[in-house]
Regions:
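Cofactor-binding active-site loop characterized by glycine-rich and histidine/acidic residues
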Residues: 37-178, 393-394, 426
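Anionic-ligand anchoring segments at beta-strand to alpha-helix junctions in alpha/beta enzyme folds, i.e.
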Residues: 86-114, 196, 214, 379-407, ...
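General beta-strand structural signal in soluble alpha/beta enzymes
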Residues: 67, 157, 166, 186-188, ...
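Short, surface-exposed connector motifs at secondary-structure boundaries
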Residues: 26, 58, 154-155, 215-218, ...
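Conserved acidic/glycine
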Residues: 1-39, 158-159, 163-167, 185, ...
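Thiamine diphosphate
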Residues: 98-110, 134, 138-142, 147-152, ...
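A short, small-residue-rich loop immediately preceding and capping a beta-strand
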Residues: 27, 63-64, 115-118, 148-166, ...
Length: 665
């Protein structure tokens, strides 16, 4: 056994295995298989190839590393501890998966220093890695000058069979290959084991051939514990400047633990005390003491970290010279990284200007996008092959492509799930604001990655058009019903449904000024009138558009989007019958709920119990505002194929029906 300890690299690799196994055992839950199987890959990359600096985790030109298989989080935490990121102590590893610890079950962005993205849903990290690689190429094309490669780094992702089974990886890698993202290097932990058993039961395709078809260079490491072979693979990946690279590393899940390695049982449960003891004996580890790491191993990692500093020092020197030689680029750089940029440039009269003609809110949003792109040069975005319909094309900004990384219009293709992960990755990279777009009914395809946006606090903007039965002729498959309620239910998410130009401008202003909350806009296909009384108060989520002349209104009509005009017209008709109502616009329930109780009570006073909510989607969620005595005019079934002018009356979205329902209270 002693011969296994004569190599400091081997000891350093095994330190990752031991810390991972002990932390998972102490927590009584976790996934030891990946950390044990991929320890050699991670060590070789982090110690000898990754451009990073634990002393400055936010260095802008660092390489990015994404653990797409987030269940293997102890691999990442062990690395962060051994490399000294954020002073992550051994005691933090001992608190793995515990309340309030720095080591949650899956890596969480902004929670643990050195974690580049929240991962856990398999394949998500692959999509975000593609987004980061896109951001790197775009920023490089904007800022680099001859002799000054101020943006020049790689994005690495590590995932396993599960990541490769998930459809999002195919979506993302298909686009990455098309875009020739040569700064993207993906490690495939090919251990041929899934939770239910061998991958032979459900996953027998030739993954390498698939990746070749996507346009990747493919490299195979036959021995996942051979550091030299792994290192050569990384260098070969870097040498290809025309294609992204996919490195298949043949590993053994749970490597080092005799009773578990190569078995499905190594994946998602603690190894057990006896098996950990046997593992340490097998690895020649000098102590059975939990979490023990020899001082010589810590010293070795410290030496590695000291060796990482010169790369950043050289970059800092180059960047200082660059800023002196190109002061206009330094100013632009600061603009890209200014988190308060939108507040400074998107609050002028022209930004909020509108004309009185009726228009679809998707068209009004398109105008806002083009106003924003002129004010914010760091905005990049696009649609899932729908920009002509969602009105998301930025004029005169070019298309992002393998031939033009400076383009600001992204063509994501029909890949909504990957599009959203890529949008997250673009923003996680830093320096850019991103938006993504599709039809509202297909927002379902974006949901898992949008959920990560909310969890991470990444203020990605979603442009969802064709927002109700107003879609009309395309029928129920294309008419959203339950989607609005779903998005409103998401924590840390602002779901806007604006009614006219003023509210659309407010929704966009809220989106681009948001620091930690993603925002979505649900926009109409059909034209809507400009409404008297809408204002910037829409930024509060809900507000009084037209009030009653009485101190206490006879009733309150609440509406959003295309139905606000119905509410306003109903108010006029009711007034003729001596019923004086208040009209409240509710473009964003989420923001309204963030207001003070005093403000909410002012808009919706508790002593006015006669309330009607009007919205051409599911009525789910409106109960909190109309109460037991109120009424909801909404959709309780799927739509139909017909002109919207036929559908709205059929389903009760008319002035006459709103008036009748108010009178019936």
């Amino acid at each position: 056994m002693e011969t296994k300890m004569n190599n400091i690299d081997t000891m350093s690799v095994n330190a990752i295995r031991v810390l991972s196994a002990d932390a998972i055992q102490k927590a009584k839950s976790g996934h030891p298989g990946l950390p044990l199987g991929c320890a050699s890959v991670a060590y070789e990359l982090w110690a000898k190839h990754l451009k990073h600096n634990p002393k400055d985790p936010d260095w802008k030109d660092r390489d990015r590393f994404i653990l797409s298989g987030g269940h293997g989080s102890m691999l990442l935490y062990s690395l962060l501890h051994l490399f000294g990121y954020g002073d992550l102590k051994k005691e933090d590893l001992m608190q793995f998966r515990q309340w309030g610890s720095l080591t949650p079950g899956h890596p969480e962005y902004r929670h643990t220093v050195g974690v580049e993205a929240t991962t856990g849903p398999l394949g998500a990290g692959m999509g975000m890695a593609v987004g980061m690689a896109i951001a790197e190429r775009h920023m490089a094309s904007v800022f680099n000058k001859e002799g000054y490669q101020v943006v020049d780094h790689y994005t690495y992702a590590l995932g396993g069979d599960g990541c490769m089974m998930e459809g999002i990886s195919s979506e993302a890698f298909s686009l990455a290959g098309t875009l020739k993202l040569s700064k993207l290097i993906v490690f495939y932990d090919s251990n041929r084991i899934s939770i239910e058993g061998s991958t032979d039961i459900a996953f027998t395709e030739n993954v390498q051939k698939r990746m070749e078809a996507f346009g990747f260079q493919t490299i195979t490491v036959e021995d996942g514990n051979n550091l030299e072979e792994i290192g050569k693979a990384i260098e070969a990946a870097k040498a290809d400047t025309k294609r992204p690279s996919f490195i298949t590393v043949k590993t053994q899940i749970g490597f080092g633990c005799p009773a578990k390695q190569g078995k499905a049982s190594a994946h998602g449960e603690p190894l057990g005390d006896d098996n950990i003891k046997a593992m340490k004996e097998n690895l020649g580890w000098p102590s059975e003491e939990p979490f023990f790491v020899p001082e010589e191993v810590y010293d070795h990692y410290k030496e590695i970290v000291e060796g990482l500093q010169p790369a950043e020092d050289a970059w800092n020197k180059m960047f200082a010279e660059y800023c002196e030689k190109y002061p206009e680029m330094k100013e632009l750089w600061d603009t890209y990284y200014d988190e308060d940029l939108a507040e400074k440039v998107c609050d002028d009269s022209e930004f909020w200007a509108y004309d009185d003609k009726a228009d679809a809110t998707r068209n009004l949003s398109g105008k806002m996008i083009n106003r924003i792109k002129d004010r914010m040069p760091n905005v990049i975005g696009g649609a899932a092959d729908l920009s002509p319909s969602t009105k998301t094309y930025m004029k005169d900004e070019g298309d992002f492509s393998a031939e033009n990384y400076a383009g600001r219009n992204m063509h994501f293709g029909v890949r909504e799930l990957a599009m959203t992960a890529i949008g997250n990755g673009i923003m996680l990279h830093g320096g850019l604001r991103a938006f993504v777009s599709t039809f509202f009914v297909f927002s379902d395809y974006t949901k898992p990655m949008a959920r990560l946006s909310s969890i991470m606090g990444v203020p990605l903007t979603f442009v969802f058009t064709h927002d109700s039965i107003g879609v009309g002729e395309d029928g129920p498959t294309h008419e959203p019903i339950e989607q609005l309620a779903m998005w409103r239910a998401m924590p840390n998410f602002h779901m806007f449904r604006p009614a006219d130009a003023t509210e659309t401008a407010a929704a966009w202003y809220s989106a681009v000024t948001s620091k930690r909350t993603p925002t979505a806009l649900a926009l109409t296909r059909q034209n809507l009138p400009q409404i008297d009384g809408t204002s910037r108060e829409a930024l509060k989520g809900g507000y009084i558009v037209q009030d009653s002349k009485k101190a206490v209104p006879d009733a309150i009509i609440i509406a959003s989007g295309s139905e606000l005009s119905l509410a306003v017209e109903a108010k006029k008709v009711l007034a003729e019958d001596g019923i004086d109502v208040r009209v409240v616009s509710m473009p964003c329930m989420n923001l309204f709920e963030e207001q003070s109780e005093e403000y909410k009570a002012k808009v919706l006073p508790k002593n006015v119990r006669k309330r009607v909510a009007v919205e051409a989607l599911s009525g789910f969620g409106w109960d909190r505002y109309v109460g037991l005595d109120g009424d909801i005019i909404g959709m309780n079934r799927f739509g139909a194929s017909a002109p919207y002018s036929k559908l709205f009356p059929y389903f009760g979205f008319t002035v006459e029906n709103v008036v009748a329902r108010v009178k019936a209270l």
